[in-house]
């Protein structure tokens, strides 16, 4: 590419440190929960999460759009809830780090605008206003230089006055300075950059913001503080006024954004409780942790500055218990399935009260199915109590969605169950120019749980409830799940791979002749080298341990790289400096330099023609000289 037609280089990207814990704070998360967060996140997104955790000042809405990550396959069953909890953890961690940035900014601004530098700044402002002679008083500007409440309206009014002074003096921003404006939002997306007129002023402001965001403990600087008295110009005084006014407004805006982010983190937890309630019904052993979480949220809403550590601890503790329950968390789908089943039961009950099912011939609905089919009743002939009927569409009867916990009397008795009277299914309609809603109360969630538990234990719901009441007294034993593993194939059995068979064969040959030396075969030499588990998983992860254990049980002495979780292929994530969309420009800038992908290879294997293929027998309806269209298709495939 020629030098003249070369695309202009983009603004420098920020360099932010990411530690081994992805910048998760130790005062918010314990070591156990930090390890859990690292195990749930893939390797491909770890650096990006560390960048978000660093606390670069950003608007809340921009940060919500930027938070992105992937969850490992080992946590697939809890993924719907894990994604929301991880997002809350990232927002809370970002809030605490960004709050430290604001504290440093306030301290250094007060140090900057103090004597003796304050006196020199005011003298420069007086000389600036006198030289312009526009009627702008120095007091109109200086009153905001030490204030903590410089709103956006106050900032605009002060900038209008400074622009009048600038125009009267004939000062304009140089093209070199305008080209460096994007640097001003590299380390702070909340900063409203003023029109600095010199390159030196732009670079100095960018360095100040970089030092504050990265918490380097360097004092803020201005042109008046770094230049000698004889070398200061009116343009330097103008740029210093720009710097102080915009930093004072940044201080206020940052504080307001942190207040909104603090309340938003609590609100996200509050909204998550709707899904966590159905997760609790799927794993009743999480009752105590769920109740503690809700009580903590109630206290957090009553304080102006809630502590995030207890709330985050309960969230991650609940997620750990849900992961150990080994059920598929699907709160939204479970909510809808409960509504469908309860509505069907209610409609059949209402029809029975109206006497619509009096005769056998009348037990047909509009679609021609009998009432039993409409109720979705299913017989269980393998139950110990004889022939039982259960609702086939009750998800609580599925062991992969709801599993009866150990000692069910501790969690499934009526007085131990956490009721939620206002469980609503809401439908939205549009009527006469307005959005209207229809609500349906789900009042039998506990009955559905008992019905599903009785199906898994092979008991009637009445008998199951009796055992729950008598088991704590020692009169009856706890109900247990009826296993039917011998009726079905074991799909979780680990297959014996080629590496396992070759290793077992070599071990048997070596044991038969201890003095003999076996050479590797051609098949084993062409196989791919096994990649160690530490390449893809963190130390001490349960997935690696599970792979090692399962391979040892199946007789395999090596782990195939296909069994290990690899980081997904992702686009390169880079920080841009465009205001409110900081991670999009870099990709579009480098997009043109990508190499074009090669076309896909031609399909392998024999093509279907009239001479070969599944229907190569000659047809009697056509003559032998009739062309078959498959011949042309095969010829075209050969020339691809």
UniProtKB/Swiss-Prot annotation:
Listed Low complexity bias regions: 500-562
Chain intervals with Basic residues compositional bias: 588-598
Region listing for Disordered, in residue ranges: 353-373, 500-571, 586-640
InterPro entries, sorted: Herpes_pp85
Bias (Acidic residues) ranges: 358-367
Keyword field contains Nucleus: no
One GO cellular component, as annotated: viral tegument
Family matches, as Pfam families: Herpes_pp85
Superkingdom classification of source: Viruses
Biased composition (Basic and acidic residues): 631-640
GO BP annotations, alphabetical order: DNA-templated viral transcription; symbiont-mediated suppression of host cytoplasmic pattern recognition receptor signaling pathway via inhibition of TBK1 activity; symbiont-mediated suppression of host toll-like receptor signaling pathway
Record carries keyword NADP: no
Keywords carried by this UniProt record: Host cytoplasm, Host nucleus, Host-virus interaction, Inhibition of host innate immune response by virus, Inhibition of host TBK1 by virus, Inhibition of host TLR pathway by virus, Viral immunoevasion, Virion, Virion tegument
Family: Belongs to the herpesviridae pp85 family.
Name recorded for this polypeptide: Protein UL35
Organism: Human cytomegalovirus (strain AD169) (HHV-5)
Lineage per the UniProt record: Viruses, Duplodnaviria, Heunggongvirae, Peploviricota, Herviviricetes
């Amino acid at each position: 590419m020629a030098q003249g037609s070369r695309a202009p280089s983009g603004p420098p990207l920020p360099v932010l440190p990411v530690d081994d814990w992805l910048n998760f704070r130790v005062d918010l998360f314990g070591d156990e929960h930090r390890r859990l967060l690292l195990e749930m996140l893939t390797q491909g997104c770890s650096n990006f999460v560390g960048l978000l955790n660093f606390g670069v000042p950003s608007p809340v809405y921009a940060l919500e759009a930027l938070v992105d990550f992937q969850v490992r396959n080992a946590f697939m069953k809890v993924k719907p809830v894990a994604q929301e909890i991880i997002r809350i953890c990232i927002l809370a961690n970002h809030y605490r780090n960004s709050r430290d940035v604001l504290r440093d900014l306030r301290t250094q601004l007060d140090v900057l605008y103090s004597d003796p530098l304050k006196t020199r700044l005011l003298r420069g402002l007086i000389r600036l206003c006198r030289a312009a002679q526009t009627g702008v008083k120095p007091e109109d500007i200086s009153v905001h230089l030490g204030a903590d409440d410089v709103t956006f309206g106050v900032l605009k009014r002060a900038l209008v006055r400074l622009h009048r002074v600038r125009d009267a003096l004939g000062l304009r921003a140089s093209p070199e300075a305008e080209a460096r404006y994007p640097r001003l939002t590299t380390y702070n997306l909340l900063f409203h950059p003023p029109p600095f007129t010199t390159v030196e002023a732009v670079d100095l402001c960018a360095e100040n913001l970089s030092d504050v965001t990265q918490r380097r403990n360097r004092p803020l600087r201005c042109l008046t503080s770094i230049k000698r008295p004889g070398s200061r110009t009116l343009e330097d005084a103008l740029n210093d006024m720009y710097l102080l006014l915009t930093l004072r407004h940044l201080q206020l805006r940052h504080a307001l954004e942190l207040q909104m982010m603090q309340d938003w983190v609590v609100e996200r937890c509050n909204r998550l409780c709707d899904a966590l309630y159905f997760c609790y019904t799927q794993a009743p052993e999480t009752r105590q942790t769920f109740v503690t979480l809700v009580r903590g949220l109630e206290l957090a809403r009553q304080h102006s500055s809630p502590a995030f550590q207890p709330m985050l601890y309960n969230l991650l503790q609940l997620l750990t218990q849900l992961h150990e329950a080994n059920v598929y968390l699907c709160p939204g789908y479970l909510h809808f399935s409960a509504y469908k089943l309860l509505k069907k039961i209610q409609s059949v009950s209402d029809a029975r009260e109206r006497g619509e099912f009096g005769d056998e011939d009348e037990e047909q609905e509009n679609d021609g199915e009998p009432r039993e089919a409409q109720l979705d009743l299913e017989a269980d002939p393998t139950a110990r109590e004889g022939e039982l009927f259960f609702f086939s569409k009750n998800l609580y009867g599925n062991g992969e969605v709801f599993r009866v916990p150990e000692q069910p009397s501790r969690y499934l008795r009526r007085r131990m169950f956490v009721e939620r009277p206002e469980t609503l299914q809401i439908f939205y309609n549009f009527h006469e120019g307005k959005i209207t809603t229809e609500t349906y109360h789900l009042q039998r969630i506990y009955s559905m749980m008992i019905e599903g538990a009785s199906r898994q234990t092979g008991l009637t719901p009445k008998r199951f409830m009796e055992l729950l009441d008598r088991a704590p007294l020692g009169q009856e034993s706890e109900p247990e799940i009826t296993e039917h593993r011998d009726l079905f194939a074991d799909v979780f059995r680990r297959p014996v791979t080629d590496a396992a068979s070759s290793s077992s064969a070599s071990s048997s040959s070596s044991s038969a002749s201890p003095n003999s030396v076996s050479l590797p075969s051609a098949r084993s030499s062409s196989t791919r080298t096994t990649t160690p588990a530490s390449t893809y998983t963190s130390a001490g992860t349960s997935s690696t341990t599970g792979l090692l254990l399962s391979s040892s049980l199946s007789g395999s002495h090596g782990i195939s790289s296909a069994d290990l979780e690899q980081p997904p292929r992702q686009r390169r994530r880079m920080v841009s400096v465009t205001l409110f969309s900081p991670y999009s420009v870099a990709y579009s800038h480098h997009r043109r330099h990508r190499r074009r992908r090669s076309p896909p290879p031609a399909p392998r294997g024999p093509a279907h023609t009239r001479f070969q293929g599944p229907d190569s027998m000659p047809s009697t309806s056509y003559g032998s000289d009739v062309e078959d269209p498959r011949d042309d298709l095969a010829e075209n495939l050969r020339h691809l």
